[in-house]
Amino acid sequence: MPKIKMIVGLGNIGKEYQDTRHNVGEWFIAKIAQDNNQSFSSNTKLNCNLAKVSIDYNNVVLVFPTTYMNNSGLAVSKVANFYKIAPAEILVAHDELDIDSGEIRLKKGGGHGGHNGLRSINQHLGTNDYLRLRIGIGHPGHKSKVANYVLSNPSIAQKKDIDSAIDNGICFLDDIINYKLEPVMQKLHTK
């Protein structure tokens, strides 16, 4: 059975994007690093910011691509090749429009659902056989509003809900790392 060796937090690089809904994946790995007293360092060769942590006695690389969302797969594939990490050993944390704020879901494989970061990862890895932690940000209501919505900051109440979902996901991280997925899915997917 595989174990997670890389956690990718999707988002856009730069202060202007740091607090936007599209960066909730980055918030997730930043919280993991903070909880483990680790900081990120820039790795220009691998097109990302990296931190290394130990979770339940497993060495895990935290990756924040510095390629912007639409080309995240470049960094993910470079890091995976460098550390010899298989797609099944990767967890990607990302924003999810189709899930309400405050909720979080775990998924193995699946399509990109219009998410350009996932689309890029699928293309660069040549597969969608990796785990995804889908952090709910809610939907603005109409397709035409999506781009502005994901690139804007959440309200204070919504930010609190998203932070709560991130904390909830981190509570199950040991089991996710060790591929004990069924009990995690049951707990996360049950209201």
UniProtKB/Swiss-Prot annotation:
One Pfam match: Pept_tRNA_hydro
Catalytic residues in the record: H22
Entry GO CC: cytoplasm
GO process annotations (BP): protein quality control for misfolded or incompletely synthesized proteins; rescue of stalled ribosome
Transferase is among the record's keywords: no
Top-level taxonomic group: Bacteria
Entry EC no(s): 3.1.1.29
Alphabetical UniProt keywords: Cytoplasm, Hydrolase, RNA-binding, tRNA-binding
InterPro entries the UniProt entry points to: Pept_tRNA_hydro, Pept_tRNA_hydro_CS, Pept_tRNA_hydro_sf
NCBIfam families: pth (TIGR00447)
Quaternary assembly: Monomer.
UniProt cross-references to PANTHER family, sorted A to Z: PEPTIDYL-TRNA HYDROLASE
Protein name, as recorded: Peptidyl-tRNA hydrolase
Record gene name: pth
